[in-house]
Curated annotation (Swiss-Prot):
Residues 429-575 are annotated as: Flavodoxin-reductase-like. Its EC number is 1.-.-.-. Keywords: Electron transport, Oxidoreductase, Transport. Residues 263-405 form the Flavodoxin-like domain. In the N-terminal section; belongs to the zinc metallo-hydrolase group 3 family. GO terms for molecular function: electron transfer activity; FMN binding; oxidoreductase activity, acting on the CH-NH group of donors, NAD or NADP as acceptor. The keyword Transcription does not apply. InterPro entries: Flavin_Rdtase-like_dom (IPR002563), Flavodoxin/NO_synth (IPR008254), Flavodoxin_CS (IPR001226), Flavoprotein-like_sf (IPR029039), Metallo-B-lactamas (IPR001279), NADH_oxidoreductase_modular (IPR051285), ODP_dom (IPR045761), RibonucZ/Hydroxyglut_hydro (IPR036866). This is Putative diflavin flavoprotein A 4. It is an enzyme of class 1 (oxidoreductase).
Length: 575
């Protein structure tokens, strides 16, 4: 497997994957966007497919990032004037840019999509109305030579216009946002599929965990098709692990639904910005073992919203501001919350706006006036979110989850005898001491720092350390092989720890008042530390509520020869 590197330019890889069928993989070896789903920084591919039978169909052209190189490469394999159909698994503003260029070259082509996608396209491009054909579940399009395409609608809150396409000739199911992974490599198929597990699971958690119910419904629709390959919108074509990957999706959905705590995430998104915020908050919740029921209020009816609100443990509402007001769907959802949700439920508010944010203020004030407690500071974002804002959203989701867990623990009746035993055990475990350290990481140009004492030397040759990190402590920046960090071992008598003693969730910069220098691996060295180690992650293991990381020490230096290591003394092993 060739892992993404930033030294290669973007390109389009073309190959045969079946009879009369080509894949065109628009590839970037760098992080494509700043959304949470791309944060593992393994690059990505935007997969498009061309079926050339008696009639020709192009499936899922990529977004604006690849428009020019994609169309240039496509022209080597297709006379645009002979293209009959363009099939869309979903529609968004990014993809519309490519569609405009493509339709100017192929004005005779018909756009095939779901009904919600057709409505969106007709609104954005009224002049296209005669060229758009909406399809329903199990509609069939015959391209000739055995290529009968069956369409399977797969709506979800994030992609209400989702559409699968199944080709009976090649038995390929084109799955768009399902069964993908953000990873760029030369391999077309999933021969080495076991090494893809981490990327696949992360992709699912980011995109589908908050909509597990709808994902299961989509899986039920395709199970009878008998597909032999999945052709996703991102990552390798699934041929060798199809049964296992399908099973994984069902298990991951069940895992979400079986969580003890459940949050209703209610939102609408006018231009996509509020939806991006919702996805980042959901990721913070999912990473902290909370089930998220994502509800796009533009699609859900009042009965469904009422049922979800009544059954959840916490409610988070997101809204854009349109003309100084919240959309009607959000006003309806807010009314349901205020009239049916117990006041003991934790709440949260977020939203995006252009010139004013009245909708966000309205929701916040209504919830506060009704005596709901907010689980994080209300998030207000003007225009498009930045990477820093998305990190704040993810941290807000983590904070919300931890507060829910604490609330549940307070409400749980205690049994006297087992509790006494637990207390004694916790007290004993708490006597384990560790060196106080600050771990510094880097996410592109953003530096992070966390305080920990859960570190020990693990190996002598090569020198290596073992460290336990909670998910909410930016564990994603150290969760895969090759990630680098600096372990700053603190010196007794210095007060460096106070800058890192609480989780920074709203953009605080703990390094602003500290002297630092940059290590060879790009992370920060605290010059007031006793010593530092530059480390590279080589192995990881999920253990309970922590990620256990083994890292090899690349280099290190003692900064204060006469200093003594700062040590944390605890009285309980529960924190």
């Amino acid at each position: 497997m060739t892992i993404a590197t930033s030294s290669r330019p973007r390109d389009v890889q073309v190959a045969d994957i079946g009879e009369h069928t080509l894949i065109l993989r628009s590839r970037t070896w760098e992080r494509l966007k700043f959304e949470v789903e791309y944060s593992r920084q393994r690059g990505t591919t935007a997969n498009s497919y061309l079926i050339q039978a008696d009639k020709k169909a192009l499936i899922d052209p990529p977004g604006e990032s690849f428009t020019a190189i994609y169309l240039e490469q496509l022209a080597q394999y297709l006379d645009f004037t002979t293209l009959d159909y363009i099939i869309l698994g979903h529609v968004n503003p990014n993809r519309r840019v490519t569609l405009q260029e493509l339709l100017s070259k192929a004005p005779q082509a018909t756009l095939i999509c779901s009904r919600p996608a057709a409505n969106a396209l007709k609104t954005a491009f009224p002049e296209w109305e005669s060229r758009i054909q909406a399809v329903r579940f199990e509609d069939i399009l015959d391209l000739g030579q055995g290529h009968q395409l069956t369409f399977v609608t797969a709506p979800t809150p994030r992609w209400p216009d989702g559409l699968f396409t199944y080709d009976s000739a090649t038995k390929i199911l084109y799955t768009d946002k399902f069964f993908g992974a953000h990873i760029c490599e030369d391999t077309l198929f999933d021969e080495d599929w076991k090494k893809l597990d981490a990327e696949r699971h992360y992709y699912f958690d980011c995109l589908h965990a908050p909509q597990a119910k709808q994902v299961e419904a989509a899986l039920d629709k395709v199970v009878m098709l008998g597909a032999r390959s999945y052709a996703p919108g991102h990552g390798p074509v699934v041929r060798y692990s199809l049964s296992r990957f399908t099973y994984d999706y069902r298990q991951w959905c069940q895992g979400q639904k079986s969580q003890d705590l459940n949050v209703a995430l209610l939102y609408t998104s006018a231009y996509g910005n509020t939806g991006i915020l919702a996805n980042a908050i959901a990721q913070g919740l999912v990473q902290n073992d909370v089930n998220v029921q994502s509800v796009n209020c533009e699609l859900a009816d009042t009965a469904e919203i009422t049922r979800i609100v009544e059954a959840c443990d916490g409610i988070i509402i997101g809204s854009p501001t349109l003309g100084g007001h919240a959309p009607t769907q959000i006003q309806t959802a807010l009314g349901i919350v205020l009239s049916t949700a117990a006041k003991t439920k934790l709440a949260g508010v977020f939203g995006s706006y252009g010139w004013s944010g009245e909708a966000i203020d309205l929701i916040e004030s209504k919830l506060k006036d009704a005596n709901y407690r907010l689980g994080f500071d209300t998030i207000r974002v003007r225009f498009s979110p930045t990477p820093e804002i998305l990190q704040q959203c993810q941290a807000a989701g983590a904070t919300f989850a931890q507060t829910l867990k604490k609330n549940k623990k307070l409400r749980t009746p205690r049994q006297v005898i087992p509790e006494a035993k637990i207390d004694r055990t916790e007290q004993a475990v708490g006597r384990i001491i560790g060196s106080l350290c600050v771990v510094t990481t880097r996410d592109q140009e953003s530096h992070k720092g966390i305080l920990t004492s859960w570190v020990s030397q693990a190996t002598f040759n090569p020198p290596g350390i073992m460290m336990a990190i909670a998910q909410e402590q930016n564990a994603d920046l150290m969760s895969h092989t090759g990630d680098q960090f600096v372990l700053n071992i603190l010196k007794e008598g210095r007060n460096v720890r106070r800058y890192f003693s609480r989780q920074s969730t709203l953009g605080d910069n703990p390094f602003a008042n500290l002297k630092t220098k940059t290590a060879d691996n790009g992370c920060l060295i605290l010059t007031e530390a006793l010593a530092y180690l530059e480390c590279t992650v080589t192995n990881q293991l999920e253990c309970g509520d922590r990620l256990l990381i083994y890292a090899v020490v690349d280099k290190g230096e003692v900064l204060a020869n006469d200093g003594v290591t700062a040590v944390e003394h605890r009285k309980s092993g529960s924190h």
